[in-house]
Swiss-Prot record:
InterPro entries: SmpB, SsrA-bd_prot, SsrA-bd_prot_CS. One of its GO terms (biological process) is trans-translation. PANTHER family: SSRA-BINDING PROTEIN (PTHR30308:SF2), TMRNA-BINDING COMPONENT OF TRANS-TRANSLATION TAGGING COMPLEX (PTHR30308). This is SsrA-binding protein. The gene is smpB. GO terms for cellular component: cytosol. The keyword Transcription regulation does not apply. HAMAP family: SmpB. Keywords: Cytoplasm, RNA-binding. One of its GO terms (molecular function) is RNA binding. It is found in: Cytoplasm. Required for rescue of stalled ribosomes mediated by trans-translation. Binds to transfer-messenger RNA (tmRNA), required for stable association of tmRNA with ribosomes. tmRNA and SmpB together mimic tRNA shape, replacing the anticodon stem-loop with SmpB. tmRNA is encoded by the ssrA gene; the 2 termini fold to resemble tRNA(Ala) and it encodes a 'tag peptide', a short internal open reading frame. During trans-translation Ala-aminoacylated tmRNA acts like a tRNA, entering the A-site of stalled ribosomes, displacing the stalled mRNA.
Length: 155
């Protein structure tokens, strides 16, 4: 958990499995009133989400925020594009790093910080299948080593 991070509402575990995360940054989200109520109720899905830089703005797509139950006519479309709030220099840096390099922007986590919904955005490079298998193999080896060390220390 990063310093000053609030209540975690949603995580994208699939992103850490499918991508190698190179860099992360925090972004604000532009939401309507009923959307923020749904986010606070943890009714958000980041699984297929991604972000794009267009015309000097960063847009979040394919993130599902369920309609708020008491929202009736004020509810928005669940998978609409949402603007992310970043500094101009951050946007320019992201645009340079994602243009033509095989890098993409994936949402990693949504949390509430000081009453505002924040998104942890990751600059990521896609993993190949053999990279995923290698990661799983390394993780299992570390677990086996930890298990053996625990057994030795208990004697």
């Amino acid at each position: 958990m990063a310093k000053g991070e609030g209540k975690v509402v949603a995580q994208n575990k699939k992103a850490r499995h499918d991508y190698t995360i190179v860099d992360t940054l925090e972004a604000g989200m532009v939401l309507t009133g009923t959307e923020i109520k749904s986010v606070r109720a943890a009714r958000i899905n980041l699984k297929d989400g991604f972000a794009q830089v267009k015309n000097g703005e960063v847009w979040l797509s394919n993130v599902h925020i369920a309609p708020y139950e008491e929202g009736n006519i004020w509810n928005q479309e669940p998978e609409r594009r949402r603007k992310l709030l970043l500094h101009k220099r951050q946007i320019q840096k992201l645009e340079q790093e994602t243009k033509g390099t095989g890098m993409t922007l994936v949402p990693l986590k949504v949390y509430i910080k000081d009453g505002y919904a924040k998104l942890l955005l990751g600059l990521a490079k896609g993993k190949h299948d053999y990279d995923k298998r290698e990661s799983i193999k390394r993780r299992e080896q570390n677990r086996d080593i930890a298990r053996v060390m625990k057994a030795v220390n208990q004697r």
